[in-house]
Protein backbone atom coordinates (compact mmCIF):
# COMPACT_ATOMS: atom_id res chain seq x y z
CA UNK A 1 0.00 0.00 0.00
CA UNK A 2 1.36 3.42 -0.97
CA UNK A 3 1.92 6.05 1.72
CA UNK A 4 1.67 9.81 1.25
CA UNK A 5 2.76 12.45 3.77
CA UNK A 6 1.63 16.08 3.87
CA UNK A 7 3.96 18.32 5.87
CA UNK A 8 2.10 21.51 6.76
CA UNK A 9 3.92 24.62 7.95
CA UNK A 10 1.28 26.32 10.12
CA UNK A 11 3.07 29.70 10.17
CA UNK A 12 4.03 30.12 6.52
CA UNK A 13 2.52 32.92 4.47
CA UNK A 14 -0.57 34.86 5.35
CA UNK A 15 -3.46 32.60 4.33
CA UNK A 16 -5.35 30.08 6.42
CA UNK A 17 -4.49 26.41 6.12
CA UNK A 18 -7.59 25.13 7.93
CA UNK A 19 -9.13 23.62 4.79
CA UNK A 20 -5.94 21.88 3.63
CA UNK A 21 -6.31 18.60 5.58
CA UNK A 22 -9.86 18.09 4.33
CA UNK A 23 -8.97 19.00 0.73
CA UNK A 24 -6.00 16.62 0.76
CA UNK A 25 -8.09 13.91 2.36
CA UNK A 26 -10.70 14.20 -0.37
CA UNK A 27 -8.11 14.20 -3.16
CA UNK A 28 -6.16 11.25 -1.81
CA UNK A 29 -9.14 9.18 -0.63
CA UNK A 30 -9.31 7.52 -4.03
CA UNK A 31 -5.55 6.95 -4.17
CA UNK A 32 -4.25 3.44 -3.68
CA UNK A 33 -2.74 4.19 -0.30
CA UNK A 34 -2.91 6.14 2.91
CA UNK A 35 -2.42 9.87 3.55
CA UNK A 36 -0.69 11.04 6.72
CA UNK A 37 -0.67 14.66 7.93
CA UNK A 38 1.88 16.35 10.16
CA UNK A 39 2.76 19.92 11.13
CA UNK A 40 6.18 21.52 11.41
CA UNK A 41 7.28 22.80 14.79
CA UNK A 42 10.44 24.75 13.92
CA UNK A 43 12.86 25.56 11.13
CA UNK A 44 14.48 22.36 9.88
CA UNK A 45 11.63 20.15 11.08
CA UNK A 46 10.15 19.68 7.57
CA UNK A 47 13.50 18.37 6.33
CA UNK A 48 13.69 15.88 9.19
CA UNK A 49 10.11 14.68 8.61
CA UNK A 50 10.61 14.34 4.85
CA UNK A 51 13.89 12.45 5.27
CA UNK A 52 12.21 9.97 7.59
CA UNK A 53 9.31 9.54 5.14
CA UNK A 54 11.71 8.81 2.27
CA UNK A 55 13.57 6.27 4.42
CA UNK A 56 10.23 4.60 5.19
CA UNK A 57 9.39 4.33 1.49
CA UNK A 58 6.68 6.96 1.17
CA UNK A 59 5.48 7.48 -2.41
CA UNK A 60 5.15 11.26 -2.07
CA UNK A 61 5.78 14.01 0.45
CA UNK A 62 3.63 17.11 0.00
CA UNK A 63 5.09 20.39 1.23
CA UNK A 64 2.32 22.75 2.33
CA UNK A 65 3.97 26.10 2.91
CA UNK A 66 6.27 28.58 1.29
CA UNK A 67 9.65 28.38 -0.40
CA UNK A 68 11.41 27.63 2.89
CA UNK A 69 9.22 24.61 3.58
CA UNK A 70 9.48 23.44 -0.03
CA UNK A 71 13.28 23.73 0.02
CA UNK A 72 13.54 21.77 3.27
CA UNK A 73 11.37 18.95 1.94
CA UNK A 74 13.06 18.92 -1.48
CA UNK A 75 16.53 18.75 0.12
CA UNK A 76 15.49 15.69 2.11
CA UNK A 77 14.11 13.96 -0.98
CA UNK A 78 17.15 14.50 -3.21
CA UNK A 79 18.44 11.17 -4.49
CA UNK A 80 15.41 9.20 -3.28
CA UNK A 81 12.46 7.67 -5.12
CA UNK A 82 9.99 9.75 -3.10
CA UNK A 83 8.18 12.43 -5.10
CA UNK A 84 7.78 16.04 -3.96
CA UNK A 85 4.32 17.58 -4.07
CA UNK A 86 3.73 21.29 -3.45
CA UNK A 87 0.70 23.15 -2.13
CA UNK A 88 1.88 26.79 -2.13
CA UNK A 89 0.94 28.61 1.07
CA UNK A 90 3.83 31.03 1.47
CA UNK A 91 4.40 34.69 0.74
CA UNK A 92 6.34 34.27 -2.51
CA UNK A 93 5.96 30.67 -3.67
CA UNK A 94 8.72 31.12 -6.24
CA UNK A 95 9.33 27.46 -7.09
CA UNK A 96 5.63 26.64 -7.30
CA UNK A 97 5.07 29.60 -9.64
CA UNK A 98 7.98 28.62 -11.86
CA UNK A 99 6.61 25.07 -12.12
CA UNK A 100 3.11 26.28 -13.04
CA UNK A 101 1.50 25.09 -9.81
CA UNK A 102 -1.77 26.85 -9.05
CA UNK A 103 -1.73 29.37 -6.20
CA UNK A 104 -5.27 28.34 -5.24
CA UNK A 105 -5.00 25.45 -2.75
CA UNK A 106 -7.91 23.47 -4.13
CA UNK A 107 -6.54 23.67 -7.68
CA UNK A 108 -2.97 22.88 -6.55
CA UNK A 109 -4.23 19.76 -4.77
CA UNK A 110 -6.22 18.78 -7.87
CA UNK A 111 -3.01 19.12 -9.89
CA UNK A 112 -1.22 16.86 -7.40
CA UNK A 113 -3.89 14.20 -7.63
CA UNK A 114 -3.33 13.78 -11.39
CA UNK A 115 -0.13 11.89 -10.60
CA UNK A 116 1.92 13.86 -13.15
CA UNK A 117 5.62 13.85 -12.26
CA UNK A 118 8.51 15.91 -13.61
CA UNK A 119 12.19 16.06 -12.72
CA UNK A 120 13.63 19.38 -11.60
CA UNK A 121 17.20 20.56 -11.28
CA UNK A 122 18.91 21.51 -8.07
CA UNK A 123 21.96 23.62 -7.41
CA UNK A 124 24.34 23.60 -4.47
CA UNK A 125 25.92 26.57 -2.72
CA UNK A 126 28.26 26.07 0.23
CA UNK A 127 27.23 22.41 0.34
CA UNK A 128 23.54 23.24 0.63
CA UNK A 129 21.13 22.26 -2.18
CA UNK A 130 18.49 24.73 -3.36
CA UNK A 131 15.81 24.59 -6.01
CA UNK A 132 14.54 28.01 -6.96
CA UNK A 133 16.57 31.10 -6.31
CA UNK A 134 19.97 32.10 -5.06
CA UNK A 135 21.05 35.64 -4.38
CA UNK A 136 24.07 37.63 -3.30
CA UNK A 137 24.54 41.15 -2.02
CA UNK A 138 21.38 43.24 -1.78
CA UNK A 139 19.15 40.33 -2.81
CA UNK A 140 20.56 38.17 -0.02
CA UNK A 141 20.19 41.03 2.49
CA UNK A 142 16.50 41.44 1.60
CA UNK A 143 15.95 37.69 1.86
CA UNK A 144 17.66 37.56 5.26
CA UNK A 145 15.63 40.53 6.56
CA UNK A 146 12.42 38.86 5.36
CA UNK A 147 13.33 35.61 7.11
CA UNK A 148 13.91 37.51 10.36
CA UNK A 149 10.67 39.55 10.11
CA UNK A 150 7.80 38.78 12.46
CA UNK A 151 5.10 39.41 9.83
CA UNK A 152 4.50 37.98 6.37
CA UNK A 153 3.12 39.20 3.07
CA UNK A 154 4.35 41.56 0.35
CA UNK A 155 4.52 44.56 2.70
CA UNK A 156 7.31 42.80 4.64
CA UNK A 157 9.68 43.40 1.71
CA UNK A 158 9.40 47.15 2.24
For every predicted segment, state its role.
Residues 1-61:
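ATP/NTP phosphate-donor binding region
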Residues 10, 64-66, 87-89:
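Glycine-rich beta-strand-to-loop/alpha-helix junction loops that act as flexible
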Residues 17, 72-74, 96-97, 141:
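Short glycine-/acidic-enriched loop or helix-start segments at secondary-structure transitions
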Residues 69-82:
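Short Gly/Thr/Asp-enriched flexible loops that form oxyanion-binding sites at enzyme active sites
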Residues 79-83, 87-158:
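Catalytic core of DAGKc-family lipid kinases
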Amino acid sequence: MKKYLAIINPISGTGSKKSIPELLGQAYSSADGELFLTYTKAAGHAEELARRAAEEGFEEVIAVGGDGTVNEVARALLGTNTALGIVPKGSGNGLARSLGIAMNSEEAIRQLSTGRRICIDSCTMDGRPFFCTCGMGFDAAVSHAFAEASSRGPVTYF
